[in-house]
């Protein structure tokens, strides 16, 4: 399998690339900092920005699957996720590449009822612009003719991969903690099994929400509000 990865140097992106290389996949990754990518003989780094259609097009070239893990940082415009996704879709439309996986968040679309009250408040206030951009991203993907899958994870942590998670569409599950490594594992399993075509599954766990997790989520929110990584 030949993957094009966008958002490759983020927490989930690095873990996905590491697991993909271990599975003997070829990876092409768009990045502004090649030093942040995992190393390997089967990874090709394309330097550039997802807002540059030519760089996006070069990344998609000679691949058969695209994984979009875009997020927003203080150095980027507030609509980078949706604008970048539009460029990705257009690049795929120009090539025989139709399989697209996109990582968004629980709390969007039909999964809005799965998040706890304090997350709903944050999404409607401090994270409103970010979630609106993610919602626009989902809309663009769903309107495309691609074989897309939108994956909505629970609260992301840096815990190790366990392989113990639950997933599905309209399942009885709430947005509990899940490691980025497990999300990466689920993304690759979805590709291998060619599952959830034109669907938006959630992926989460049955873990209890502990003080440490709440603190991690709170500090992450604070960093976003203060404009730091």
Describe these PLM feature segments.
Residues 3-23:
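N-terminal Rossmann NAD(P)H-binding glycine-rich loop of SDR-like oxidoreductase domains
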Residues 4, 28, 149:
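Conserved beta-strand positions in the Rossmann-like core of class I SAM-dependent methyltransferases
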Residues 9, 173-229:
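Mid/C-terminal beta-alpha module of Rossmann-like enzyme folds, strongest
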Residues 12, 66, 137, 151, ...:
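Non-catalytic, hydrophobic alpha-helical segments
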Residues 30-35, 49-50:
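N-terminal Rossmann-fold cofactor-binding loop
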Residues 44-64:
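Conserved Rossmann-fold cofactor-binding substructure of NAD(P)-dependent oxidoreductases
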Residues 73-100, 132, 136:
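NAD(P)-cofactor binding segment of oxidoreductase domains
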Residues 138-159:
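Conserved beta-loop-beta element that borders a ligand/cofactor-binding pocket
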């Amino acid at each position: 399998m030949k993957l094009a990865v966008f958002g490759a140097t983020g927490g989930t992106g690095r873990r996905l690339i590491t697991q993909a290389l271990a599975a003997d996949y070829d990876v092409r990754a768009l990045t502004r900092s090649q030093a942040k990518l995992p190393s390997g003989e089967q990874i090709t780094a394309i330097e550039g920005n997802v807002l540059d259609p030519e760089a996006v097009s070069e990344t998609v070239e000679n691949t058969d699957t695209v994984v979009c893990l875009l997020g927003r940082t203080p150095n980027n415009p507030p609509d980078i996720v949706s604008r970048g996704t539009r460029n990705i879709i257009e690049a795929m439309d120009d090539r025989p590449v139709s399989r697209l996986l996109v990582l968004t968040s629980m709390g969007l679309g039909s999964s809005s009822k799965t998040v706890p009250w304090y997350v709903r408040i944050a999404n409607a206030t401090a994270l409103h612009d970010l979630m609106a951009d993610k919602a626009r991203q989902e809309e663009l993907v769903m309107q495309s003719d691609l074989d897309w899958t939108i994956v909505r994870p629970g609260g992301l942590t840096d815990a190790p991969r366990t392989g113990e998670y639950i997933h599905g569409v309209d399942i009885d599950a709430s947005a509990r903690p899940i490691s980025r490594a497990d999300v990466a594992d689920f993304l690759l399993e979805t590709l291998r099994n060619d599952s959830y075509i034109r669907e938006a599954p959630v992926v989460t766990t049955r873990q209890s929400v502990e003080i440490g997790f709440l603190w991690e989520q709170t500090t992450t929110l604070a960093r976003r509000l203060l404009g730091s990584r």
